[in-house]
Amino acid sequence: GAAFAMATVTDGQETSDGATLTYPVVKADAPEAQQRINTVIEDDVKAFMQEIDAARVAGKPPAAKMSYEITKSSDELLSLKTEQFISEESAAHPMSYAHGYIFRLSDGKALTLADVQQLPDRKEHASRYTLESLNKRLAEPKDGAAKDFKKLETAPKDIYMDANGHIHVLIQRYEAASYAA
């Protein structure tokens, strides 16, 4: 395939009363890929802003912030991790979410664990990236499984790749344990 240049990432920012959201804006060689990538990120930003607005409407103005880091960038893939934090005025616990993305720069697709299995350098280890293998590893106490750990029903969509090419799976607290408010 044609070689693509690495994507460039700049800060996008939304600020409003008590909230500062900094998110990645991606510029890629292929315009359709660029649009696809930015739409995925914008949808997550919008969903978080709706949560912030809902708290305001409920009369609990929150402090909220969002940040991101680029975890891996090559001429084929761009991987990002975002952190979202919201603390409502009277809530016992602040909530935090981490989202991970691996985007393919040729078409902008956000890769899933199933897609990762198909990457040329992963095929021989494809079984590592299955839901079954993930649940097995999560259930091992050394991986910090909560006592009330419940198996994941579906493969987590929040994944990212680090600089060494390792795949990290982010599991939201509410996906793997019962959450007591």
Where in this protein do the model-derived segments appear?
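Compositionally biased intrinsically disordered regions enriched in Thr/Gly
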Residues: 1-181
